[in-house]
């Protein structure tokens, strides 16, 4: 059965020769889950990624999102609903694969101040604050984090083992990251947030 939120599942899958694993590249607004050995990869600027796994079974996943700019008007309202949706979609899919919520652990990354167009809204810091607050509220322990600062990061997540490799990109040789995040920001500003999502128990 297909769910409405399946449209956010990453579709860019490939075989990573360096690590010898099936891999998924997660773009802004997407997520991916795995119940076997796999590699999840993303590049983060102002966005954040939550890597959540069942520490016993190795079922895990990663999302990649940012809160829409609300101009500082709506700290816990509409803007936070986008982040909550991104987190709950990931958690629901993990539970659907058989993960147990009481065995979840999280690692979080991103929230850098890397886009000049987003600097005034401090969106990276808002994203980082949101993801930490969400996980605290949901009682999911954060076992590792690399947040804020002024550079992009490339994150390699191996959900089965929980291992993460983070490459800090002090030099970005093209504007792909920046254009992806700007495009995502534009999509967020025009997208209605209808309805709620219920947690799969």
Swiss-Prot record:
Catalytic activity: L-glutaminyl-[protein] + H2O = L-glutamyl-[protein] + NH4(+)
Swiss-Prot/TrEMBL GO biological process terms: chemotaxis
Keyword Disulfide bond in record: no
Entry EC number(s): 3.5.1.44
Pfam families: CheD
Classification via SUPFAM superfamilies: CNF1/YfiH-like putative cysteine hydrolases
Gene3D superfamilies: 3.30.1330.200
Hydrolase is among the record's keywords: yes
GO terms of molecular function: protein-glutamine glutaminase activity
Domain of life: Bacteria
Class of this enzyme: hydrolase
Keywords: Chemotaxis, Hydrolase
PANTHER family (UniProt xref): CHEMORECEPTOR GLUTAMINE DEAMIDASE CHED-RELATED (PTHR35147:SF2)
Its biological purpose: Probably deamidates glutamine residues to glutamate on methyl-accepting chemotaxis receptors (MCPs), playing an important role in chemotaxis.
Stored NCBIfam families: PRK13487.1
Protein family per UniProt: Belongs to the CheD family.
Name assigned to this protein: Probable chemoreceptor glutamine deamidase CheD 1
Designated gene of the protein: cheD1
């Amino acid at each position: 059965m297909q769910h409405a939120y399946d449209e956010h599942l990453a579709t860019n899958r490939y075989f990573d020769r360096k690590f010898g694993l099936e891999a998924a590249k997660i773009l802004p607004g997407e997520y991916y889950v795995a119940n076997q050995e796999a590699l999840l990869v993303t590049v983060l600027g102002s966005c954040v990624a939550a890597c959540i796994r069942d520490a016993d079974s190795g079922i895990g996943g990663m999302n990649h999102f940012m809160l829409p700019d609300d101009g500082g008007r709506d700290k816990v309202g509409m803007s936070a609903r986008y982040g909550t949706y991104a987190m709950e979609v990931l958690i629901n899919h993990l539970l659907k694969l058989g993960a147990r919520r009481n065995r979840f652990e999280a690692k979080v990354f991103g929230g850098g101040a890397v886009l000049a167009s987003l600097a005034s809204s401090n969106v990276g810091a808002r994203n980082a604050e949101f993801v930490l607050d969400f996980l605290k509220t949901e009682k999911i322990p954060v076992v590792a984090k690399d947040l804020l600062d002024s550079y992009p990061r490339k994150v390699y997540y191996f959900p089965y083992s929980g291992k993460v490799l983070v490459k800090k990109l002090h030099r970005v040789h093209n504007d792909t990251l920046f254009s992806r995040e700007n495009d995502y920001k534009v999509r967020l500003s025009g997208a209605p947030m209808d309805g709620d999502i219920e947690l799969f128990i």
